[in-house]
Amino acid sequence: MFSLQELCRKNIYILPYPLGEHVLQQLGLYWKGYGSLQRIGDDHVLLQQDLIFSINEALRMAGEEGNNEVVKLLLLWEGNLHYAIIGALEGDRYDLIHKYYGQIGDCHKILPLIQDPQIFEKCHELSTSCNIRCLLEHAVKHNMLSILQKHKDQIRFHLALTQILFELACHERKNDIIRWIGYSLHIYQLETIFDVAFAHKNLSLYVLGYELLMHKVNTEAANIDLPNLLSYHLRTAAAGGLLHFMFETLKHGGYVDKAVLSAAISYKHRKVVAHFIHQVPRKTVEKLLLHAVQTRAPKKTLNLLLSSLNYSVHPITKQLVRNVVDYRSTLIVKLLLMRRKRKLNLVDAVLARLVRYSTYTDTVKFMGEFSVSPEKVIKMAARESRTFMIEMISKAVWKNHPQTMIHHLKQLADTMKPQSGKDLIIYTIHYIYQSSNLLVAEEEKNIFKLAKFYANHNSVNRFKQICEDYYTLDVDTRFKTLILECFEIAVQKNYPRIATIVDDFIRFLFYKGDITEEEISEAYSLKNAELYVDLKWLQQEEN
């Protein structure tokens, strides 16, 4: 046939009318027994100007008849060869199959198009390299239960094959086949059906799983730990928020406990918690609240648990504080503060634990969330000997300005009660002083005040050092004033070591001629001054 004629046959849609049977036969547009054959659109044919079929249905009919000429024409019209093969199998036209065998490719691709189990099996036989297991697996995939029933005896004697087919049926979600295997054959592991049901949230498959499980329990001496299995299923269902799965499980036993509701909380399924929360003891609810804080549960879940406890959480306050800090979960603190009645302020308790155990970053974040004053945090840090925390917060709050930092820290030291905390703040002040290059004339007044501050707090070594530093500024008159005022402080507050240091500086000033005997005598005339200094040196100088 000429290529032009082939091209016309492939693309002609409207036949010149009328054409005789002989002409149509010559054109290859005639189907014996039906009449003229005409293409309509992209995927239909018209027979004898009357009957309309899809191209693929026409291919199946032609294949069943073994009519290769019509098959070739319909393939030109973009029909699917697989339908011709199906028709040939239905008509036992193996000669036609042989002609196209090289074009078929993988015969397994034809199987989804077949509804008849016998044709299905015949088609599978075209793949000479396949075995019975391959046939049975494809029968499962394409829901050919009758094929499995036909080969039941072969399956029965291969336990591993039974399990393979069962698991395949579960993954393909072929419930009829699953049920047949479950009742007709022995399955040693049922868990796959539940795994697939959970994965696809398929309740009907889950119900079927329990139907088979109970059948197995009642009819076989199966070694099944049913309570443990039920508990596992409840936890899994709760974690997935599958409330109806939980109802189905509870029909067969089991109970909802802390582990089950903890799973629901962890995966944020509040509806599951809401349904069962009133069925568990108060102690369990308290543990669930702690778990909710640990997993940073959303506001609605926390409120649900708090409401169940009537917002009374005093028995677990310490654990709550620990979880808030350890898991950086502060929402519960805010919710308890928002209550008009039964309000519980955990801010100070949480803050104390943060300062003791957590990082500077976590502490500052909490300060911002709850508007905590830096002074409060610094005092807590001083009590816990967190020097780094004091320094970092001071720098952050007071813009790393040395004079401002020292000013505020001095105020805190003045009001700090524990001596260890006071000493740590003073240590921090001196560190800031030393590392900030404040020993300049412009800072003379601030250094003067700082020296008196050290004297007031009996910080002996720092007092001595800052006095030596102050003297280098060449402010002799002011230095003398500082020394005399600090001597008065030492006497009034009973600080003998400060008094001794002052006495040394007074002698130094006297020998330099920067202070007179009268000034010294006046300073040492204070009540009880003789208890702190030895005036003999001055009397010797007079003689």
From Swiss-Prot:
Supply the Pfam families for this chain: DUF249
Instruction: Report the coiled-coil segments.
Output: none
Induction, as annotated: Expressed in the early phase of the viral replicative cycle.
Disulfide bond residue pairs: none
Question: Which UniProt keywords are given for this protein, alphabetically ordered?
Answer: Early protein
The record, for InterPro entries, names: MGF_505
User: Tell me, what does this protein do in biology?
Assistant: Plays a role in virus cell tropism, and may be required for efficient virus replication in macrophages.
Protein family membership? Belongs to the asfivirus MGF 505 family.
Q: What is this protein called?
A: Protein MGF 505-10R
The organism named in the record is: African swine fever virus (isolate Tick/Malawi/Lil 20-1/1983) (ASFV)
